[in-house]
Amino acid sequence: MSGIQATDEARETYQKLSRSKIQYVVFKIDKVDGTEVIALDCIGEKVKGDEGQDACWEDFCSKLPENEGRYGVFDLRWTQDDGRKRDSVCFVSWTPDGAKIRQKMMYGATQESFKGSLDGIKSTIVAHDASDLTDERASVLKK
């Protein structure tokens, strides 16, 4: 464990997602007052029903920089072929191939402790490029 803790703002924003107020949250490791912390990067507004889920996922993915790591949490919702409604609060670890080695190590070392501090996570996506995001989301939606 790296010892990097989430800011109060980051934790409070995640609580809004878990109470179905927002669709996704993106976090980044940042320096605040000389200390590395997991901070809020951006949020995505809630979409109603299954409609808009794909567009919202695309918007979420567009917030993940090509050369910097991020964590994300996305409230996935879908209807299965048999008509059953499903949902999964999905943790996303984004460490792109273009990120610096030190940054990849920090995100890797902090991932499990940060994810463990977030109640209600049902699935995890570990992605290094855009195709990983697409493939892993499809895998979650099949479960």
Segments predicted by a language model, with ranges:
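Long, low-complexity regulatory segments enriched in Ser/Thr/Pro/Gly and acidic residues
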Residues: 1-143
